[in-house]
């Protein structure tokens, strides 16, 4: 179930302040955040936001087609190493 339209999209205030502060600077630095729940706004386009995945910050370059999605969608939290190999030689009969 999505968020109500009357509420509007959610973004953490501290993240919005960091993006607005960098809008004045010429050089765009990587913005670190723990806020995976924040919605990507059109003003974020062109910035690199490092989203925390539980172990490290994953750099995510914001593009136009990402607007409206959540930051956490682009920083997976689980690493899939694949299923165990089916080694028939070592199996007992």
Swiss-Prot record:
InterPro entries: Ribosomal_uS19 (IPR002222), Ribosomal_uS19_bac-type (IPR005732), Ribosomal_uS19_CS (IPR020934), Ribosomal_uS19_SF (IPR023575). Keywords: Ribonucleoprotein, Ribosomal protein, RNA-binding, rRNA-binding. GO terms for cellular component: cytoplasm; small ribosomal subunit. Coiled coil: none annotated. GO terms for molecular function: rRNA binding; structural constituent of ribosome. PROSITE patterns: RIBOSOMAL_S19. HAMAP family: Ribosomal_uS19. NCBIfam families: rpsS_bact (TIGR01050). Protein S19 forms a complex with S13 that binds strongly to the 16S ribosomal RNA. Belongs to the universal ribosomal protein uS19 family. This is Small ribosomal subunit protein uS19.
